[in-house]
Amino acid sequence: DGKVILNDNGLPIRDNFQQNLGHTDPKWILGFQNSFKYKNMSLDIGIDGVWGGVMRSLTVEKMWWGGKHPYSTEFRDAEYAAGTPVYVPEGVNVVSGELVQDANGNVVSDNRVFKPNTTAVSWQTWSQNYPYRAQVTEAENKTFANVFDRSFFKLRSLVFKYDFTDLINIKGIKHFDMTFTGYNLLMWKEADIIDPDYGNDNNLQDPSTRYLGMGLNFK
């Protein structure tokens, strides 16, 4: 039923076979580039993005390991005050039976009987195991997820120019315009915390940088 299977110590049991969590390539790659002009004003706009696909975030995994994830302090103070583990992972323990799989990981038989887990574990131990060592999708557990939907749309570029030539009368200046430029201004994304613009996060990349600029052009 999708619950994590835990051992007697309350920690996840490693699957002997790898599972397919999705494709890293998106279903769609989209882009829009256009220019608009009205009298002395012009506007260039660029929007792009992808739809579908998944990405693993090594950054999120390392944040859990090092206690830097926004949720990584959730039970730490309570555990410190109690002097004993207080976090009881949501999952099940095997009471009896066994799972038999073939060489490809297909289930041959499964007569296991489960019970809800009641074992509390150290919050640090849990954080440095499940969300760090396992590949967790948002569908499996949104709090501990490190595999995300990489869909996003971004206002990649916006360039606004205004020509002041007709408004000024300065000797020696035949043309004068001002330009405002912006890159990576806005983003809609499915994933929290991370920047899916890179397509993967295996090298602990910094997120894309927002840039704002202004230029003056005299002739």
Question: Predicted regions: what is each one?
Answer:
Residues 11-20, 138-145, 196-200:
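Extracytoplasmic loops and strand-loop junctions of Gram-negative outer membrane beta-barrel proteins
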Residues 40-45, 167-168:
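Repeated loop/turn-to-beta-strand initiation elements of outer-membrane beta-barrel proteins
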